[in-house]
Every structure is written in C-alpha cells, then in structure tokens.
Amino acid sequence: MLVVGGGPAGLAAAAELGLRGVECVVLEPRAEVSHLRPRAKTTSVRTMEHLRRWGVADALRAAAPLPVAWSQRVTFCKSLSGRRITDFDNAFGLTTTRDDRFAEAGQQVPQPVVEDVLRAHIERLPGVELRLGHAASTLIQDDDGVTVGVRGRGGARYDIRARYVLGCDGAVGVTRDQIGARYVGRSDPRPNFNVVFRAPSFDTQLGPAVQYWVLGATSGLVGRLDLAGTWWAVIPGIEAAYGAAHASELITALLGGPVPHELVASDPWTAHMMIADRFRDRRVFLVGESAHLNPPWGGHGFNTCVGDAVNIGWKIAAVEQGWASPELLDSYEPERRGVVEQTVASAEANMRSLAGDLPPDGPAVQLAKRPEFHSLGLVLGYSYAGSPVVESTADHRDPVDVTNYTPSTEPGARLPHRWLPEGASLYDRLGLGFSLVGPLRARGPGVSTLADLARQKRIPLSLVDSAANQPFLLVRPDQHIAARAADAADLDLDLAIGHRVPGTHAVSTTSSSASGE
C-alpha cells in the first residue's frame, strides 16, 4: 500500500491502515510541519471519534493550545474592544459534559498540531513507514498494481511498486492529474487575507471565545492560536498586495485600537467549491483535497478529508486481508461523493453571510449563522443509504438537516451513540471488523447462524449486547450501519463486504452451533 501525501488525509489513511495491521508507505514532501500557517482549526466530534478509535484523542487534547474548558463560544462584536452583538455557545460541538449523541466532543486545535500528533502516532505503528522529504512524480498502472516514480531527498529518484495507491496529495499534487481526473466547480471571486500575529499584552474584555467575528468598518474574524499571545485573523475581501501593505492597520481596526503587536505570517487565499469528476481510476483513489475543495466556513474541510480516509482505509484493509471482495472498493466514490456534495453546499451557504455581509443585530446574526456553528446534523447525520454495500430500501440519500441531528438506525446511518451504565462508550465495545449489535441475551439461533457464517468466511465479527427492544444491526468498521433486521440471520454479510450486488438473493447458512465470540 502506498499513500501519496502526508497531510491530514494521508496521515488519517495511514492511521486507519496501521490500526488494521496493513503495511503501507507514506510519501510526504515536507520534512517538517510549519506552524506559521495554522489552516484548519476545527476538529469535529466525528473526527474526534475516529481519533478515539486510533487511540490518540487524549494525545491531541493534551497538545491543543486551547483546552475545550477554556471556551466553547463564538462571539460577534463591533471590535474586540467594542460592543458584544451576540454569542453562540457550544459551537462546533465543543462541550465539557458528556453528550449521548457522540463519544468525543469537538476540539479547537490548529491543523499543524493535529499533523504533529498523527505523525508521532503512525511512526509508532508497526508496518507503517513515513518517508519525509519524498514526493511522488509519476504513476503507471497495470493489471497487478501501480508503479510510482518518487523523488527523494537530495533529488534521488526511485520507483515503488504498490497494489493500491491513495492519492492524498491535495490540490497541487500529481495524483489527480496522473489519473486524468479534473476539478469541476467554481471559485469565489472575493479574495481573502490571513494574518498571524503576536500581541502578548492584549486581552479582550469580551471574555474567552474560539472565534470573534468583527462586524465593523473593517470586518473579519479573529481568534487565539494559544494562550500566550499568538493570534490569527481572516479579513475577507482584501487583496494580497493591500493586505501585505496594511496588515498592521487591519489588525488595529479588528482589535479596536492601537495594540503592540508583531506580524508573524500572512497568507492570501481564495475559496473554492470544487469536486473531482471521479475519485478513482482502477487501483488509484483520490482522498481528501485531491478529490474536493471547499470553503473553510463551518470548519468541515479538514474533517471531510479524514472521513474519506477512514472510508477507503478500512475497505482496502478488508480486501488486503482477504475477507472482502475487491468490489467493496467500488463503494468508496458513491458513498463519499454524496457527503462531499452536501458539505461543499453547506460551506458555500455559510459563505453567503460573511462578517462584512451581516448587520450588527443579534437576532439577524443568530438566524444567518446558526448552521455554521451548530451543524451536528451534517457532522453526524450523513448517510451511506443507496450505497452498493448497504442493505437499504432507499436508492438515494435525503438532504441532511445541517443543524439538527436525529439519531437513526436506518442502514447507511452512523450507529447512534450512547454511554453505557458503567460509563464506557458504546463505540468502545465495537470490534475492529464488523459488529453485531442487538439483544444478544434473547439471541435465538439467528445470532449463532450469523456468527458461524462470519467464521466460515473469515470475516471478523464482534457481538455487542444492546437493548432488548432493538433490532439487530450489522455495524461496519467505520461505525456505519450496513444492515438492520429483526432476526440476525437475515443480515446480509455478503452484500456488506462486496460479495453480492444489491437486489440479488442472499443465501442463508444455518448452523446448530452457538458462537461464544
């Protein structure tokens, strides 16, 4: 296995593969992660649940410069020294109390910190090799694999042979072009300007917040990168040349007056709403920003990349380990494309009401911006219904309610989370492979039938007891529901691993022996 690119998507893919014992090499051109450009800052509750599975959620929280307890708020104001307009509490899934809806709260943390934590993690995984300073240059496919030309440190060139390649090399990487895919979509005509600055002596009287949206003559966003005086700012509508020449004036206006500060870095950028016309060519898969670009408003971009990596990661592991059909991989694009389309649409909707577009009126701001800061419906409520490996009567996904999350046991949905009486998460009881979740104490012959079938097919299956009045759920390694039935024997394992196409007859295998797994 070869992972091209060691940013968030590539590191997440390596973590997923390494968790499952699949050997892989990760090529990453950057020897070190730069902390001058923080990029994404929102790690969603869903991504934190994946980090929990990998065993690094606590490590990320320990490394995060802003503890969740410090603030869970987004504040709108005239300036950081001026009038408060309104607040959004528990933004981005930030909470210090347990919530039955998810196993992990969100975390505000700069992307470079996430990358550092994941780099350290995958370097400890047996069979995962992170080659820093190495970049892919060419990909040539044949029936048996992919030959990848690599440029190593010092310019040395060599080839790697891989059965599958995950292209996680972003917008400017080579993978998308090498397979002949292209972005389809548009770019926002407005420029944007980012600034990182140091102002150790400044503190706002508005109280702690993970973001301050300034609605004034100079409008934009400001936030802390740490609690030691490092700040970031985003000023929409500012050209690069003007921003570079007037950065100090812009900072002064946002803060509400002259404040001693030091400019650390600046970064002009443009928002893109782009999705590749295909996510796969035979043995090469596009993952993360190589497959899609979306505006940062709502904090979904980085998290969507992680979701891609998890989806293809467990599937390739299943194929490599011999318990799933290669046809399982055909489900990657249909499952993830729908999620990506919904996410890009939500981010674009958020972009229609940036700081300069909003009136300084609390109720109006609440109405316009609630879907941006309270988006659990999108983060947790997306479904893989209609997938070729999900036993669902639906042939499509209904649009999600971005704000409101309604737990569902419909096939394709994420398994509804709950905290168990002993204090553990239901998710901690799931296995690395598939899990049968249901009323095992009244198991009947169906549970043994399914367990025996899984054993015959070498499909890893864990048994998880649940409420007596619930149906049986076949839960995938990514915590999404593959099938639901009143009798466990009616759950279609063959469909879930790509061995049978939807609509064909499933043949049950009966057995008189009981499983004690």
Tell me the role of every PLM-derived stretch.
Residues 154-164, 168:
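Core beta-strand elements of the Rossmann-like FAD/NAD(P) dinucleotide-binding domain
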Residues 132-147:
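A conserved short coil-to-beta-strand element within the FAD-binding core of flavoproteins
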Residues 36-40, 44-121, 224-225:
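Active-site-adjacent segment of FAD-dependent monooxygenases/related oxidoreductases
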Residues 317-421, 425-434, 439-445, 469-470, ...:
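C-terminal helical "tail/cap" subdomain of flavin- and related membrane-associated enzymes
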Residues 122-136:
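A conserved beta-strand/loop element that lines the FAD pocket in flavoprotein oxidoreductases
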Residues 60, 120, 164, 168-271:
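Conserved FAD-binding catalytic core of PHBH/FMO-like flavoproteins
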Residues 6-16, 118, 167, 263-349, ...:
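Conserved mid-domain beta->alpha element of the FAD-binding
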Residues 18-40:
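Glycine-rich FAD pyrophosphate-binding loop
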